[in-house]
A protein has these predicted regions:
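C-terminal motif of bacterial Sec signal peptides marking the signal peptidase cleavage site
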Residues: 14-17
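Acidic/polar, low-complexity intrinsically disordered N-terminal segments immediately downstream
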Residues: 19-164, 453-454, 465-516
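Preference for solvent-exposed, low-hydrophobicity sequence contexts
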Residues: 163-173, 179-181, 185-411, 428, ...
């Protein structure tokens, strides 16, 4: 019976295949609509520049009658589909740019009414303001913090400066001494009147934090209203992005998160618990995190590493030791003097995940003369530490202002003696004097910053220093990891500079790894 059914199915299939096709087809070449006179991209200043376009339109159909549509939509949208706003229904466009400073796509649709055929032209449009491109400097006067902006209209080297922008626009400085600057490209706010993604600069201090609309530099929230619940402690604060579009807030050793792929209004949730007993903890200001990773923290109370995966949950996740680790990730009796991220490596199939390498400098709580340099290999919620003991013979032993070169040479930079910049090769422990700031200056930070934007690319070692109530930030090129030549530029202003960050319309969380 089974064979009979198979035979009948084959016969039916053959009869169907032999059915004559009486449909009518037109095999002539399809219509082609050509549009000329539109550039491949545009960069325009909001409320100042007009987008004036007079395209040439033609068709291979001789009797074509066209109708037109100009529209624009935002590229950086999460949680909903992009919405096309109609600008005009004419062949030409003369439109005053009013959109917020961010990435947009201009759409030009030409339709032949005779045939119904349409041609679409999609063009990236970067909308900027004076505030949306340049080097931002977080600085303080010892008790209050502010922002300076060094303008870069045509290249990465600044040509102008705007001082004390935060206070001049918002009416007052931010309390406390400045900490890290960070940037969030998909932070939610209602600054435009409706809830949506807002490109946001975050200024943090040891007493407060402010989310700031890059479009206008007006503050959105400060610590008083940045949390759903009023904070019981105020500072030290810092905000940074993590994997899964999560944002993290450290405040007074506690951590809060926003899961940004879910509905939110730009406010951070409740304090993460350490365990079911709500055991007290106090997280270090140092962390390991970027948009590819979980966020990893070190509890200074218990000397224990913890993690948060993609911002989710209500409690910190514990870390397991990998066999062969030189030091446990839990209760290791250490104080962290520095910690940061060195590299992220994607494992091929069947793993299909990222693993991370970080670095830390520890000091033993029982014997403060014992210091250790640790390489930290992280895979999910497991960790292996490989230790190198430091002695007085190592310059790093007395180092300060440490920083790592994420994704590049296996080097750590640090300052010594207040005015010397040193590097340490983490592969062979070789230490090298890289630069000495002039007499009287004191180094306040060292950073490695990179950017790949066309015409604005940079790969700098940046050294901040202070003298007589003013700051200097020297920006150096590097060769094989070492400082190369004289500074490309030196930024100067009043106060003490604590951090620097480059912002442009193309910058996002993935282009900046925020760390000390």
């Amino acid at each position: 019976m089974k064979n009979l059914w198979i035979y009948m199915m084959v016969v039916v299939a053959m009869m169907t295949a032999c059915k004559k096709d009486h449909s009518n087809y037109d095999y002539k070449t399809g219509e082609k609509i050509t549009v000329k006179g539109i550039e491949s991209s545009y960069t325009l200043i909001s409320e100042l520049d007009r987008l004036t376009l007079t395209p040439e339109v033609s068709s291979t159909e001789p009797n074509a009658q066209f109708e037109y549509l100009w529209g624009i939509y935002e590229t950086n949208v999460q949680g909903s589909a992009p919405v096309l706003d109609t600008l005009a229904k004419t062949k030409d466009l003369n439109y005053l740019i009013k959109q917020a400073a961010k990435g947009w796509v201009l759409v030009y649709r030409v339709t032949n009414k005779t045939t119904g055929y349409s041609q679409y032209i999609n063009v990236p449009v970067n909308v900027v303001t004076e505030f949306t491109r340049g080097w931002y400097v977080a600085k303080d006067d010892g008790t209050q913090s502010d922002l300076d902006l060094f303008l870069t209209p045509t290249s990465i080297v600044p040509t102008g400066k705007r001082e004390n922008l935060y206070s001049s626009i918002n009416g007052s400085k931010l309390p406390g001494q400045a900490n890290l600057l960070s940037f969030l490209s998909a932070y939610k706010s209602t600054v435009t009147g409706t809830l949506g993604n807002t490109r946001t600069l975050v200024l943090s201090t040891d007493k407060d934090v402010a989310t700031v609309n890059v479009n206008t530099l007006k503050k959105i929230f400060t610590l008083d209203n940045l949390l759903f619940d009023a904070p019981t402690v105020k500072g030290p604060c810092q905000v940074f992005p993590g994997g899964g579009s999560a944002y993290y807030l450290l405040n007074g050793g506690n951590v809060h998160s926003i899961v940004n792929i879910s509905a939110n209004i730009g406010k951070f949730g409740g304090r993460f618990l350490k365990d079911a007993n709500n055991t007290p903890y106090s997280l270090s200001k140092y962390f390991i995190s970027n948009t590819l990773s979980n966020a990893y923290f070190f509890d200074e109370t218990s000397s224990t590493f913890f993690a948060i995966g993609n911002g989710y949950g209500t409690a910190l996740s514990s870390i397991s030791d990998v066999t062969g680790t030189a030091m446990s990730a839990s209760n290791n009796n250490q104080k962290v003097l520095y910690m940061g991220l060195k590299s992220a490596t994607y494992l091929p199939s069947p793993a299909l995940r990222y693993v991370f390498t970080g670095c830390a400098v520890f000091q033993d709580k029982s014997n403060s003369s014992n210091k250790t340099l640790s390489s930290i290999d992280i895979d999910g919620y497991t960790m292996k530490l490989t230790n190198t003991s430091l002695t007085n013979a190592d310059k790093l032993y007395n180092g300060a202002n440490m920083t790592l070169m994420y994704g590049q040479e296996n080097l750590m930079y640090f300052s010594m003696g207040g005015n010397q910049v040193w590097s340490r090769n983490l592969s062979n422990n070789f230490e090298k004097l890289e630069y000495t700031v002039p007499a009287g200056e004191e180094i306040t930070f060292i950073r490695h910053k990179t950017g790949a934007e066309t015409n604005y690319a940079y790969n700098y070692i940046m050294v901040g220093s202070k003298i007589n109530g003013t700051y200097k930030i020297r920006m150096f090129n590097k060769a094989s990891g070492s400082i190369s030549g004289s500074p490309v530029a030196t930024l100067e202003g009043t106060g003490t500079a604590k951090d620097i960050l480059y912002i442009s319309p193309s910058v996002s969380e993935s282009t900046n790894t925020i760390q000390w």
